Structure formats: C-alpha cells, structure tokens
Amino acid sequence: MDYHILKKYRYTNRNQFESIYSSRYKNELALHYDFEIHGFPCFSLPTTEILNLTSRIYKLTQTLIYLKSKLPQIALEQYTQTCLIDEVKLTNEIEGVNSTRREIQDILNTQSITQKNIRLYGLVQKYNLLKNSEKISIHNCSDIRNIYNELVSEEIKNNDPLNLPDGIFFRRKSVSVYSPHMKEIHRGISGETEIIACMEKALFILHNKSIPPLIRISVFHYLFGYIHPFYDGNGRTNRFISSYLLSKELEPLISYHLAKTIKQNISKYYKSFDYTNDTDNRGDLTGFITNFLEIILASIEALIDSLEDKIERLHYFEQILLSNFKDKTDYGILHLLLQNSLFGLEPLSARKMAEMLDKSYVTINNRLKKDSIKTLLRSDIPHKYDLDLDILKTL
C-alpha cells in the first residue's frame, strides 16, 4: 500500500485526517525526533518502501565498488575527477552560480589559489577531500560555519557581501525562499539564538546511532533546509554535507553524483521540501526520507550504468590494441590515451603522458610521431591528444 502524505488526507478524507495522523504518530514503530515543524513534533515511519530502498542502496553500493575494482588505476582517477568536476559545476548551477569545467579543472591541476579562482577554490578543494576519505568534523554550529566558510564564503563575498552571515555562526535577520513568481514558499527559522538551538537538535539527530544511518542523513538534509541558517549558500552547504556523509556511509564516488541527480529531479526535490514544510503535514518526515533515498538510489544506478558501459567499451578497444600493437611502449601510450578518452575530460599532453607512464618526454614525443600511432590521434587542442575511437574501430 502506498504511503500518502498527510496533507493529501486533509482534502480527500477530512473526517479521518486526525485519526490517520494519530495512528501514524503513535505507531509503535515510529521514529520520533526532538524537533518541531510548526509546533508539531517530527516523526517518520519505517515503511516497506523505505526498507526496500535502503536495502537496494546498500546492495548496489557493493556492485559499484566491484565495478570500480575492474578499472585500471588511471581510468579510475580520471573518472573520479570527471565526476567531481561535474558535481561542483552542477551544485553551483542549481543555485544559479556560473562555473565552468575548465575553471574547476584548472584548480585541481594547479592546486594553488589565485585572485581569479578564489571564488571557487574552497568549494573545489572541499569536494576533492571526499575522494581521499578525509574526516570533516560536523558536530557543532562552529563546524557548520567552518564548512560554509570554506565552501562558499569567498564567492558570496565577491557577489554580494551583504549576504554573508552577520551573527556568531549564522544569520541574525529573517530570510525567505521564493518561487519564480516571487511567492514566499518558506521562511527560515528566525533569530540566530533559535537557529543555533535548532541546528544543535538537528546535529544531535544526525549523530544518534539508534537511528539507521541513511535515515539520519535524509532527516538532517531536510532539517538543514528547513532551518535555512544562512542568507545565501544554504543549498550548496547542505548538499556538500550530505555528499560527505554518503561518502563515509557508502562509497566516495556516490558523493560526486548527488547534485547531478538532484538537478535531474529538481521539481520533485523542491516539492518534497514544500509538502514537508506544510502545516498540514504535521511533522511527518516519511515522504521526504523516501524521496531523498530515491535520489541516492538513482545516483548509484546512474553510476553503475555509466561504469558498465565504459568498462565494456574499454575491454573492446583493449582487444583491438593488443592485437595490433606488440611493442610495450606503444601499447602503453595508446592504452593510456584510451583510458583518458573514455574516462577523462580533457586530452593529454606529451609531458603529462611521460609523467603518468614514467617515461622521458623525448620517448613519448617520438612515439607520437610514428605513423601507426599518429593516425589514431585526435588533437583538437594544440599539443594535446586523445584517441580517435572511430578510427580505432576500423583496425
């Protein structure tokens, strides 16, 4: 039986609305949270759908880990970086902040901060930490503010300094979220004292180990959005925290696909916030948890589909290379270019190839001039190379 949001019963079954709410809230399996939405204590139910989603998420995470193990190291590094770049670009895009793949790639390549890249540097570096399984403290309001500072404060300062937090940790004044037609759809918690109190409750829920991990992560994602602790940057900070938590609970690669899946389902994502915020929903978080778990599952499924396709193509082209190139250095160069063509974002220079293959630049440059190799190269950018897979197919 489908689990309908409470608000729906207010209009379709008014006579039973109170009894349906009461039966849900008092259900012996209900999880109760020390947090109120419009005066109603929050709760959720472990529906069959939530249990199935959770089970499938953990099962497919193991499939994803297995597929990662089938990739050559260079292919895995290139694929991870490609996903990271797309995640940063899309988490900005959701908020209407422009950033290009080239800007993000340059920060990852140079690892240095400049006046030109300062607005994105912190965001990129923070996401880059996820692939290395580094620990980030998310235990108190100071931690939340530190994450915000490192992620988005420079970009917000450059764009509109008045949108920077004016309290100890968070904003002091009120803030609202508006629809494209300028209708107020949500008003964040008012006053920094109350914001701090609510955030501390949300963090307690996040670290309450009596609650299943994916439920905690989903609930915290909602509560952060409901509290809306900053004037600007709430969405990016919230998504990063969820990405970090998922990287720890599941697999780091999943953390680089959350914004993409949210953007693909943006209407459903915002709608789940809207109806959970509604007074008639009476603090029932079950629907939001279900939708957020669906987003996590869709992220994993998309990664699996992508990797399965790329691994199949990799094996196909590897056989062509093995049949046609017996020289180890020639094969090594072409195999590297094959991995980059399938899994990377930008072509490789001879110097980069020399570094990756531990060969001299002269050796790589001379081999690239060989007719048997040169005919397979595509060079859309001067002195940078990819394999032309259409030509490789004909061998």
Predicted feature residues:
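Short amphipathic alpha-helical segments and their helix-coil junctions
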Residues: 60-71, 125-131, 200-206, 268-277, ...
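Phosphate/pyrophosphate-binding active-site loops
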Residues: 2-49, 181-306
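C-terminal regulatory or interaction extensions
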Residues: 221-229, 239-395
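A generic short alpha-helical patch detector that favors 3-5-residue windows
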Residues: 56, 76, 80, 96, ...
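N-terminal structured helix/loop subdomain that forms the ligand-binding/catalytic interface
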Residues: 1-157
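Active-site core of Fic-domain adenylyltransferases
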Residues: 81-83, 89-231, 239, 243-256
